[in-house]
């Protein structure tokens, strides 16, 4: 047989060729063998050796060795000695009826070893010391067998031409490791597998195994004799295996690794396999010395499919039988194979990385008698069919896959099972596997990652017996409890994604167990069997308020009396099911009052939550659930009393109460959300325990509903002490159903609309036991309201009932309404029991109506009405037909008050109104008291007769010109007293009031007619009112009635006091008064007297009286024309005419020394208060006091001359002299003068004269504009242009500052500053050109070449700050950016300015010849001017563009001339502040914008001389002239309302003389740079020139305002220095600084330079 190449041997021995690779290689070698086989050698000698002896011979007989790859047929009963070194032969065939000895003397490889001919016999193999026998099992094909040749090279068929199968080792008998270190190797060319192994039959036995090593390097080998266990070392390569299916000792035991033998796995990937088969009548107990596997290199399979078996640790169960207890010491795998009814028992510790439990058919049993541990990343897989596993010690199954099998792991008492269990890893949708705890136990995760589920879609976790099973982590499994004492204890954070007690245990039934929590936990499935047989007994929450039990199931079913226990610190139950119907069939037991939360906040209004059980405890020591949040669900609370501290109802949520008792301390809900339903289906009553609050005042419920009565007579709500109901609507489902019973005492509140919705009324209300009930909203009842046992019904809204009665006469109805309400009762056929009293406590009015025709008795009766608390101003309207003196009782009606009469607005009373009946007030009848005045009202055209001497009430009528009052209570020497007749001016008037006796009326008289009978005196006005509206008639026949008005009387302007007979009746005013009409021209009264001191009278109507005596009163003429007529009039106080007319119609009026006149002139309409003295009247006076004339003058002062207004008209009929005038001018017009004169016709008149020019001139003089040049002339021009809008707007100015600012902003300008800045811009450009000329003129001049210096800064014209460094080329381009900051202070009265300029000059020049240079340049500038002083706020922007030509000529030695011409265009944007007054004289700022173009042009010429003063110093004196001319275009301002000016200007020009010198130093070399320094100084003097005479006019103005003159200085001084830096002949850079100084003017300029020479 051909040998394998050496490299292949090395690969295999090194483990670099896998089992599959080796198979491919071996197959290749076999397929090539057909051509390689030479011989079929047969034995025939006594001493047979493969090197030749004992085999068939050649033709010339010789001992020829057996060729490699030959097959050997043993024909003779002689042993065979394989003595060829590294011999490799195809196989052995036993062809003799003897057991044949085979000795391996050299390392030998054999293929098959068969006894196919004589199968009763075998080859007995003996391996010599240190020798290796490798068996490949290579077979022979038919073609190969037919083609073999003998030693004589003659074809002799092998095995008669029949094939030998691969792996035919049936001929193997005893294998004797004759001497130490011999080795048997199974390296099958055609590897076998575990399912189809190479089986060594019963004849194959091991002898002297202690000397040998058995290597399985390729293929699966199954041995049948226990002697194989005696081999010193069995080595199994990756992917290969050995199967022990052996006989056993008398105890059916196979001892492995005994006596120092070992079974080793030599591979690196842990796929080598040791299989232990439990065999019928043979080995069933595998006794292991040490541990199998380890170092993660092999898999051990224990197979009891055929018969029960046991894998035992020889050292005892507490020792490892598989792997060792460390990461590297574990077996790579452990497989347990069982079958239906078969048991595999592992009596020792198992440490394997991966474990497989497989059952050929269902219900195989695996028992682990000690630890099972697959390690941190190990796995367990259940395969083939369902099996059961029992553990006895804490075990770690790692990542366990139940493989979609109904497998079970049973955990005994006090054992911890660790792992992460999956029902079907290949299909997560499947559910399989059960973990059963017999008693106490723990199920833990094997993963350090808390996000990894402990169980994932397994069927169940069972607690089958009494004990506590502790769970943690996340589980997707059903929890099953099989014993009443079974408990699942959930650690903090545990999640159960499954049901509880829905399915029977494996092998048992469910029972009512318990779930307890150590912290927060989640159970997503239903709890408790719906049939109730397996309902849960108890759920106990963690004793921690911060922990939550989340329940996601729709059915939470407890056993009878089952509880959910909230311990002392409470905890939260969170309900999250999305099913439509959710049932919690548990009692909620509360350990500590106001603890614990039920959170169903996630439920929607499409879901119904039913709680069938008690919540908390109601009793002497209430224990309430801290909070129950129902979300938006409909929640039904039934089958037990409920105690909840806070009931939270989400939007659209509803709670239904049944027939039990409910304590809800408070509800939390959005305003107008949430519904409570009372539905006592078992009996007709629901009870609200004391302290219940449904809704709140700030957040009422949407609805409280009384459910249908069903088969009951009524639906009754029994209300405990202190219960409050707040809802927008309180409704009843059935009409006339729903009754309230308040009998627990205390105070109850019912807030909301009670009944009436959809026409459904409630039934009855009953109050007993001293209970106070407040119905704050509208309430509608069909039945009666009964109040007994000192109870009080408080009504705050409309109230409807059949009647309101008190059987024991102790009931009180109290009105607490804040707005008007109506009480509607039915007329009764028989009298009802009287109320103790009606109390009014709120400020709202109450109307009591009666309807129906059942009888003539009233629906509510009482003899007392009491006003208390906040009822001041409230009105009670009694039912029609109840008078003040009857009220249906034997005694008159008593009206009491304790609310006083004072309010923030004055006097007020609570009132009772009757209608449809006349009343008589008897003397002694209790109506009000001295400190608590009440009101009596007539609601119809009926009468009241007052016989009480003192009536502590005012009387009024509701309807105008209805009701009569007769006042007869006075007695001789004691006038009667009443507190007003009518409520005030403008209110309804009595039709008639009659005073038959003297009276003090301490209030108003509001009557169409009030008659004061002859001889009767009435004093009116006081604490209850001071109004008089209507008419008072003095006297019943003779006109000799008298009326006296108290201090402060207010008569309506239309009121009238008349007399039944001319010149009779007196009217007296005791203090201040507004007076209406008194008497008339035909029937004057006898006298009108004003007797108060230091008082005043407002005259609103005409007064006709024989005597009018105003005393010292100050008179106010309130109406437009007041007439005084009669006999004599006396005035000795101020007459304030306002703008009205006082007419003296007749008689003589005498004015005393204190008389003065005050009038008001309103120029807007020309009205002036004045006095008219008609013919037949005379006014006599001496000299009056000061005449005060108030002028409200907003009128236009745009007039000339004098206007007049008459103050007293009557000429000589005014006999006297007015006092000196005092003018008080208000309004916006300051620009007129007023005076008082007596005209030629003797009338007194007021004059008004225009004074605008003087006012404005003074305003300007006292303002910042004062002293500004030209301002006085422009002010005169402005105020004389009276037809302009600006002038008219000025006249609204309120004060001198506003006036000055308005005018000053118009008549001053900034044109001088702008022009000077524009000229300076042109000079800046010329300076830059002079710099360039100063440099270029040095070109080719020997005298100056050495000293050539840099440029200077900005100076006038051609005065350079120094010349640039010498050029060595004929032409170049240059650019000089510059920045200038100039400040001109105020000078000569002309406002200063600040100007900032940025610009750049860019030039290009060339040498025309050696002495002449010419060039051109452009300049771009931007200047921002901010004007100062009185022009502060004005701004100007100037954007300029210029074009220039320049040149320089060298004259005679050291003399030169240079010059330039410039033309520039500037765009000017000017913004000037102006002002505007609104109609009220309020001043606002506006901006006048002017945009125009400016053109400036000119030139300059300078001559100079270069003088070398000393070595390194060049002095150049210079002198020259500059001329510039500037012209602005005309423009019109925009942006203001009245102050836009048209501006017209002419040209400006200027000629300057320039004298100065510059000094240049020699070149300084710094590193590689040449630096040229320079300093200079120049004087610039203005020789001649002028600024443009700019003129401006407003719209409508004819004479223009002129611009302000230039006041700036003529002489200025320039000082500067600069430096240029040159790095090479082409590039040059520079920097310079200049200061320009003159009187009150400074400017600073900085320049940069860059030049490129060509």
UniProtKB/Swiss-Prot annotation:
Gene3D superfamilies reported in the protein's UniProt record: Autotransporter beta-domain
Post-translational modification note: The N-terminus is blocked.
InterPro entries per record: Autotransporte_beta (IPR005546), Autotransporte_beta_dom_sf (IPR036709), OM_autotransptr_brl_dom (IPR006315), OmpB_passenger_Rickettsia (IPR022095), OmpB_ricketsia (IPR048195)
SMART domains per the UniProt record, alphabetical: Autotransporter
Stretches of the chain forming a coiled coil according to its record: none
Top-level taxonomic group: Bacteria
Cellular compartments per GO CC: cell outer membrane; cell surface; extracellular region; periplasmic space
UniProt signal peptide: none
Swiss-Prot/TrEMBL keywords: Cell outer membrane, Membrane, Periplasm, Secreted, Transmembrane, Transmembrane beta strand, Virulence
Prosegment location in residue numbers: 1334-1361
Positions of the Autotransporter domain: 1366-1654
Pfam (any one): rOmpB_passenger
Function description: The 120 kDa surface-exposed protein is a major structural protein which may play a role as a rickettsial virulence factor and/or immunogen during infection.
Family: Belongs to the rickettsiae OmpA/OmpB family.
Protein name, as recorded: Outer membrane protein B
Source organism of the structure: Rickettsia rickettsii
């Amino acid at each position: 047989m051909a040998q394998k190449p050496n490299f292949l041997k090395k690969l295999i021995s090194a483990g670099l060729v896998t089992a599959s690779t080796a198979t491919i290689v071996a197959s290749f070698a076999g397929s090539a063998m057909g051509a390689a086989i030479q011989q079929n050698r047969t034995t025939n000698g006594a001493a047979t050796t493969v090197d030749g002896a004992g085999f068939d011979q050649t033709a010339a007989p010789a001992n020829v060795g057996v060729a490699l790859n030959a097959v050997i047929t043993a024909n003779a009963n002689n042993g065979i000695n394989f003595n060829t070194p590294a011999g490799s032969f195809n196989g052995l065939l036993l062809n003799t009826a003897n057991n044949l000895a085979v000795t391996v003397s050299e390392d030998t490889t054999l293929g098959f070893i068969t006894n196919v001919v004589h199968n009763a016999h075998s080859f007995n193999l003996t391996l010599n010391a240190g020798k290796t026998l490798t068996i490949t099992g290579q077979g022979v094909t038919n073609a190969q067998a037919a083609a073999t040749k003998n030693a004589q090279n003659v074809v002799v068929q092998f095995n008669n031409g029949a094939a030998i199968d691969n792996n035919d080792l049936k001929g193997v008998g005893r294998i004797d490791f004759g001497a130490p270190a011999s080795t048997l190797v199974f390296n099958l060319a055609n590897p076998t597998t575990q399912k189809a192994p190479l089986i060594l039959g019963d004849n194959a036995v091991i002898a002297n195994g202690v000397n040998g090593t058995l290597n399985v390097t390729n293929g699966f080998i199954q041995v049948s004799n226990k002697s194989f266990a005696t081999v010193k070392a069995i080595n199994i390569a990756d992917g290969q295996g050995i199967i022990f299916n052996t006989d056993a000792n008398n105890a059916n035991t196979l001892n492995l690794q005994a006596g120092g033998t070992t079974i080793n796995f030599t591979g690196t990937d842990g796929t080598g396999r040791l299989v232990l088969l439990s065999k019928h009548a043979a080995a069933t107990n595998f006794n292991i010395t040490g541990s199998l596997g380890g170092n993660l290199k092999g898999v051990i399979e224990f197979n009891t499919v055929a018969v029960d078996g046991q894998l035992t640790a020889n050292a005892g169960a507490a020792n490892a039988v598989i792997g060792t207890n460390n990461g590297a010491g574990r077996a790579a795998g452990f497989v347990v194979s069982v079958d239906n009814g078969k048991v595999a028992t592992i009596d020792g510790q198992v440490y394997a990385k991966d474990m497989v439990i497989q059952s050929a058919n269902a219900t195989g049993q695996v028992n682990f008698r000690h630890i099972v541990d697959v390690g941190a990343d190990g796995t367990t897989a259940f395969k083939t069919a369902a099996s059961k596993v029992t553990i006895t010690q804490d075990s770690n199954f790692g990542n366990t896959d139940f493989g979609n099998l109904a497998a079970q792991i049973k955990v005994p008492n006090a054992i911890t099972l660790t792992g992460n269990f999956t029902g079907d890893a290949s299909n997560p949708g499947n559910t399989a596997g059960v973990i059963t705890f017999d008693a106490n136990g723990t199920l833990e995760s094997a993963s350090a990652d808390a996000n990894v589920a402990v169980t994932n879609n397994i069927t169940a976790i069972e607690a089958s017996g009494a004990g506590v099973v502790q769970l943690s982590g996340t589980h997707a499994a059903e929890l099953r409890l099989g014993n009443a004492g079974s408990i699942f204890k959930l650690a903090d954070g545990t999640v159960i994604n499954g049901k509880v007690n829905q399915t029977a245990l494996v092998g048992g039934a469910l029972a009512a167990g318990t779930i307890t929590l150590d912290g927060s936990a989640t159970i997503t499935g239903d709890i408790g069997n719906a049939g109730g047989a397996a309902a849960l007994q108890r759920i106990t929450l963690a004793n921690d308020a911060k922990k939550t039990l989340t329940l996601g199931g729709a059915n939470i079913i407890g056993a009878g009396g089952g509880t959910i226990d909230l311990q002392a610190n409470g905890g939260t139950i969170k309900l999250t099911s999305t099913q439509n119907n959710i049932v919690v069939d548990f009692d909620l037991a509360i350990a500590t009052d106001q603890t614990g939360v039920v959170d169903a906040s996630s439920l929607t209004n499409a879901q119904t939550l039913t709680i069938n059980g008690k919540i908390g405890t109601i009793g002497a020591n209430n224990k309430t659930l801290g909070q129950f949040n129902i979300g938006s669900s409909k929640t039904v609370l039934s089958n037990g009393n409920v105690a909840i501290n806070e009931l939270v109802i989400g939007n659209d949520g509803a709670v239904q109460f049944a027939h039990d008792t409910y304590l809800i301390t408070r509800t939390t809900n959005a305003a107008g959300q949430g519904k409570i339903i009372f539905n006592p289906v078992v009996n007709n009553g629901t009870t609200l325990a004391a302290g219940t609050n449904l809704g709140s005042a700030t957040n009422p419920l949407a609805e409280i509903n009384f459910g249908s009565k069903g088969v009951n007579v009524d639906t009754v709500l029994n209300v405990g002490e202190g219960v409050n109901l707040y809802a927008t609507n309180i409704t009843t489902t059935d009409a006339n159903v729903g009754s309230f019973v308040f009998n627990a005492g205390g105070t109850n509140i019912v807030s909301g609309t009670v009944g009436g919705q959809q026409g459904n009324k409630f039934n009855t209300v009953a109050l007993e036991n001293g209970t106070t009930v407040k119905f704050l909203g509208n309430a509608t009842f069909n039945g009666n309201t009964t109040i007994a046992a000192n109870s009080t019904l408080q009504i705050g809204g409309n109230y409807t009932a059949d009647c309101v009665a008190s059987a024991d006469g102790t009931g009180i109805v109290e009105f607490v309404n804040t707005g008007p309400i109506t009480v509607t009762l039915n007329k009764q056929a028989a009298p009802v029991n009287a109320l103790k009293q009606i109390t009014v406590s709120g400020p709202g009015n109450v109307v009591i109506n009666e309807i129906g025709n059942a009888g003539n008795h009233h629906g509510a009766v009482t003899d007392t009405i009491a006003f208390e608390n906040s009822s001041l101003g409230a009105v009670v309207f009694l039912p029609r037909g109840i008078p003040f003196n009857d009220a249906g009782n034997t005694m008159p009606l008593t009206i009491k008050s304790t609310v006083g009469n004072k309010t923030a607005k004055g006097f007020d009373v609570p009132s009772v109104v009757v209608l449809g009946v006349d009343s008589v007030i008897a003397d002694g009848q209790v109506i009000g008291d001295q400190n608590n005045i009440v009101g009596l009202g007539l609601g119809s055209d009926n009468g009241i007769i007052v016989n009480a001497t003192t009536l502590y009430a005012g009387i009024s009528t509701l309807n105008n010109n209805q009701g009569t009052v007769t006042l007869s209570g006075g007695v001789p020497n004691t006038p009667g007293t009443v507190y007003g007749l009518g409520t005030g001016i403008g209110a309804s008037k009595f039709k008639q009031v009659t005073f038959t006796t003297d009276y003090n009326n301490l209030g108003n008289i509001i009557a169409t007619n009030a008659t004061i009978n002859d001889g009767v005196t009435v004093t009116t006005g006081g604490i209850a009112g001071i109004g008089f509206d209507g008419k008072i008639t003095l006297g019943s026949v003779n006109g000799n009635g008298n009326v006296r008005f108290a201090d402060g009387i207010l008569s309506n302007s239309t009121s009238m006091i008349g007399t039944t007979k001319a010149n009779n009746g007196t009217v007296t005013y005791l203090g201040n008064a507004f007076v209406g009409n008194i008497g008339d021209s035909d029937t004057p009264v006898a006298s009108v007297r004003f007797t108060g001191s230091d008082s005043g009278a407002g005259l609103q109507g005409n007064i006709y009286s024989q005597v009018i005596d105003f005393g010292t009163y100050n008179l106010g003429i309130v109406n437009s024309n007041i007439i005084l007529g009669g006999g004599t009039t006396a005035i000795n106080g101020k007459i304030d005419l306002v703008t009205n007319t006082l007419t003296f119609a007749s008689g003589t009026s005498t004015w005393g020394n204190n008389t003065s006149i005050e009038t008001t002139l309103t120029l807007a309409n020309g009205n002036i208060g004045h006095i008219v003295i008609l013919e037949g009247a005379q006014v006599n006076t001496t000299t009056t006091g000061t005449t005060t004339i108030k002028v409200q003058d907003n009128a236009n002062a745009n007039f000339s001359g004098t206007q007049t207004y008459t103050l007293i008209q009557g000429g000589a009929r005014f006999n006297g002299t007015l006092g000196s005038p005092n003018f008080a001018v208000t309004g916006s017009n300051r620009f007129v003068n007023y005076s008082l004169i007596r005209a030629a016709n003797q009338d007194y008149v007021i004059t008004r004269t225009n004074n605008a020019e003087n006012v404005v001139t003074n305003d300007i003089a006292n303002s910042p504009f004062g002293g500004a040049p030209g301002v006085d002339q422009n002010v005169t021009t402005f105020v004389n242009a009276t037809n302009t809008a600006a002038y008219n707007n000025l006249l609204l100015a309120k004060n001198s500052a506003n006036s000055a600012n308005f005018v000053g902003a118009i008549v001053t300008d900034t044109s001088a500053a702008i022009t000077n800045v524009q000229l300076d811009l042109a000079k800046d450009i010329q300076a830059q050109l002079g710099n360039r000329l100063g440099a270029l003129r040095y070109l080719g001049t020997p005298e100056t070449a050495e000293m050539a210096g840099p440029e200077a800064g900005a100076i006038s014209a051609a005065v350079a700050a120094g010349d640039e460094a010498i050029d060595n080329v004929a032409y170049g381009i240059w650019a000089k950016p510059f920045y200038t900051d100039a400040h001109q202070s105020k000078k000569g009265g002309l406002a200063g300015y600040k100007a900032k300029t940025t610009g750049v000059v860019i030039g290009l020049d060339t040498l025309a010849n050696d002495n002449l240079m010419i060039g051109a340049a452009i300049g771009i500038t931007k200047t921002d001017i901010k004007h100062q002083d009185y022009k502060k706020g004005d701004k100007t922007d100037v954007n300029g563009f210029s074009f220039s030509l320049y040149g320089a000529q060298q004259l005679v030695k050291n003399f030169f001339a240079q010059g330039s011409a410039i033309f520039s265009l500037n765009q000017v944007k000017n913004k000037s502040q102006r002002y505007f007054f609104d109609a009220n004289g309020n001043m606002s700022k506006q901006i006048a914008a002017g945009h125009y173009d400016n053109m400036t042009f000119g030139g300059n010429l300078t001559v100079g001389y270069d003088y070398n003063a000393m070595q390194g110093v060049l002095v150049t004196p210079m002198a020259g002239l500059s001329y510039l001319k500037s012209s602005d275009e005309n423009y019109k301002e925009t942006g203001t309302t009245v102050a836009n000016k048209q501006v017209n200007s002419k040209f400006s020009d200027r000629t300057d003389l320039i004298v100065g010198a510059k000094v240049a130093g020699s070149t300084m070399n710094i590193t590689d740079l040449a630096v040229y320094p320079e300093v200079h100084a120049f004087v610039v003097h203005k020789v001649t020139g002028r600024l443009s005479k700019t003129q401006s006019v407003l719209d409508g103005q004819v004479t223009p305002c002129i611009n302000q003159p230039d006041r700036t200085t003529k002489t200025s001084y320039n000082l500067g220095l600069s430096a240029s830096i040159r790095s090479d002949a082409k590039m040059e850079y520079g920097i310079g600084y200049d200061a320009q100084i003159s009187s009150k003017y400074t400017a600073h300029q900085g320049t940069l330079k860059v030049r490129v020479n060509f």
